[in-house]
C-alpha cells in the first residue's frame, strides 16, 4: 500500500515539475503539421515586446500566456539575465477567456515591460491580472492569433515556451516550462549571474 501511495505521489510531483500552462481543451487549436523550431522563423513571424539588452545580438524568444503563473515565474527568473540578453516576450491566447484581452493590452501598452510587471504582481496576488477590454483591434487580435498558431506549429503543448540560440554551442534550443535563473542561464549557454 505504501508503495502505491509513493508511486502516485511521485507521478503527481512529476506532473507539477513540468511547470507549464496548457490551453483549455475547447480552445486548443487543431494541431497542424509540426515544423522545426527556428529562431529565424520566430524572429520573422512572431510579434511581441522586447526587454533587457535591446541592442544585444543574442535574443531569447518567450511565448507566454498572460494567465499562466509559470510564465510569470519565468518573467521574474529572466530579470537578472536582462543585462546581457534581449528577451522578446510573445503573447498568445489559449489558457482562458482573459488571455487574449490581456495579451492585447500588453502588446499595445506604451510601456509593456512595466505593465507586464504590474500584471504579474496582480496575477501572483490572486487578482487575475490586469483588467483588459474585450474590445480588441482586428490587427492586434490577428497578431495574437498568428503568435498562437506559430507556437502550436512547433508542437508546443504548454507555455512558457522558450526559443533561443545557445551562446556556447550556437545551436537552437527550445523548451516548455519555467526555469529558475541559474537553470535558465545554463540552458541559454550563459554564465550564471
Annotate each language-model stretch with its function.
Residues 97-142:
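Conserved segment of the thioredoxin-like fold in thiol-based oxidoreductases
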Residues 106, 175-176:
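Short acidic-hydrophobic, aromatic-tinged amphipathic segments that line or gate anion-handling sites
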Residues 2-5, 12-99, 135-158, 166, ...:
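Extracytoplasmic thiol/disulfide redox context detector
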Residues 160-174:
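A short, hydrophobic beta-strand/beta-hairpin element that forms part of a small beta-sheet core
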Residues 90, 128-129, 173, 184:
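Charge-rich, low-complexity amphipathic helices
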Residues 124-130, 155-163:
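Hydrophobic transmembrane alpha-helix bundles
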Amino acid at each position: 500500500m505504501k508503495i502505491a501511495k509513493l508511486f502516485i505521489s511521485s507521478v503527481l510531483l512529476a506532473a507539477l515539475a513540468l511547470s507549464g500552462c496548457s490551453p483549455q481543451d475547447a480552445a486548443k487549436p487543431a494541431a497542424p503539421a509540426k515544423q522545426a523550431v527556428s529562431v529565424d522563423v520566430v524572429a520573422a513571424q512572431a510579434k511581441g515586446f522586447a526587454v533587457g539588452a535591446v541592442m544585444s545580438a543574442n535574443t531569447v524568444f518567450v511565448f507566454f500566456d498572460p494567465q499562466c503563473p509559470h510564465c510569470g515565474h519565468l518573467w521574474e527568473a529572466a530579470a537578472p539575465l536582462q543585462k546581457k540578453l534581449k528577451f522578446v516576450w510573445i503573447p498568445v491566447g489559449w489558457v482562458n477567456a482573459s488571455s487574449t484581452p490581456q495579451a492585447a493590452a500588453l502588446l499595445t501598452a506604451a510601456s509593456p515591460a512595466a505593465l507586464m510587471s504590474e500584471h504579474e504582481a496582480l496575477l501572483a496576488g490572486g487578482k487575475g491580472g490586469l483588467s483588459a477590454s474585450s474590445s480588441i483591434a482586428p490587427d492586434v487580435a490577428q497578431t495574437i492569433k498568428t503568435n498562437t498558431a506559430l507556437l502550436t506549429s512547433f508542437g508546443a503543448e504548454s507555455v512558457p515556451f522558450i526559443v533561443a540560440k545557445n551562446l556556447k554551442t550556437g545551436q537552437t534550443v527550445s523548451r516548455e516550462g519555467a526555469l529558475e535563473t541559474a537553470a535558465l542561464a545554463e540552458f541559454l549557454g550563459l554564465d550564471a549571474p
